[in-house]
């Protein structure tokens, strides 16, 4: 995914948590600029087969295959992307709340990661939910965040490590909560596979209607709401009107 190029920010901002360190990092980049040119050449080398393919079949070096699909950076759907019943990241993957809590702890325990991960995640959230189809089609939860779970494992692990230093009952309670979240996540995934969570049309009513059931119950499908995809491609998010004959 081309938008993942923002990972470069993580490496640039690693161990940068004050202005002095930022100055030092900028100076370092300029001093070692030839290193970064080498990295760029290596990057382009990996992409060379794709460039050749594009030129051969489209006569274009860079071919945009999404045609009329685009980002709407002036209208990011951040709230819905994080919390909505349709495809809220933190609703369907609540385990990541632990990582977000851990990001606060980074500023006190692991400063070298603090700014790098925060800036990266904020920018990633903004870019991901600026895409016209912020729910990203047929999938369980927000699949676009899967690429970032390795990075988010750092603040997650920090939370567990800090809790391990507390009283045993607190640590055991925390581990138990993590276990419950894992079970919940797998339960929700099974619901998705069995059909009681729709891949894109889930509403609050539909979510709770069949919450305790793996398979959709009677009346479930009447509670779904399909986005108007044509309008969404224009940056307007409304519900597609149902045909009264159906």
Regions found by a protein language model. Name each.
Residues 10-11, 33-104, 117-128, 183-195:
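Membrane-lumen/periplasm interface segments of specific transmembrane helices
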Residues 6-43, 100-110, 154:
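Perimembrane helix-loop-helix junctions
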Residues 137-146:
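Non-cytosolic membrane-interface motifs at loop->transmembrane helix junctions
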Residues 32, 36, 88, 110-114, ...:
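Membrane-interface helix-boundary signature
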Residues 139, 173-246:
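Membrane-embedded, lumen/periplasm-facing catalytic core of multi-pass transferases
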Residues 17-24, 56-60, 105-112, 134, ...:
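Juxtamembrane transmembrane-helix termini
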Residues 91-119, 152-159, 174-179:
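Hydrophobic, aromatic-rich transmembrane alpha-helices
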């Amino acid at each position: 995914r081309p938008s993942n190029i923002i990972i470069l920010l993580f490496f640039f901002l690693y161990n940068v948590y004050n202005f002095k360190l930022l100055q030092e990092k900028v100076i370092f980049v300029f001093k070692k600029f030839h290193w970064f040119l080498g990295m760029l050449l290596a990057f382009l080398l990996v992409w060379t087969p794709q460039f050749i393919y594009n030129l051969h079949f489209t006569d274009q070096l860079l071919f945009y295959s999404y045609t009329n699909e685009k980002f709407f950076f002036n209208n990011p759907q951040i709230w819905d992307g994080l919390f909505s019943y349709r495809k809220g990241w933190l609703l369907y993957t609540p385990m990541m709340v632990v990582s977000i809590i851990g990001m606060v702890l980074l500023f006190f325990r692991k400063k070298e990661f603090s700014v790098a991960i925060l800036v990266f995640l904020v920018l990633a959230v903004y870019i991901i939910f600026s895409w016209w189809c912020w729910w990203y089609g047929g999938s369980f939860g927000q699949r676009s965040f899967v690429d970032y779970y390795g990075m988010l494992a750092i603040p997650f692990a920090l939370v567990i490590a800090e809790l391990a230093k507390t009283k045993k009952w607190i640590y055991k309670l925390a581990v138990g909560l993590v276990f419950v979240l894992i079970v919940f996540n797998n339960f929700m995934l099974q619901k998705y596979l069995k059909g009681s969570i729709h891949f894109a049309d889930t509403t609050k009513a539909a979510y709770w209607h069949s919450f305790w059931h793996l398979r959709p119950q009677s009346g479930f499908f009447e509670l779904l709401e399909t986005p108007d995809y044509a309008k969404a491609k224009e940056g307007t998010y409304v519900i597609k009107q149902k045909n009264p004959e159906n």
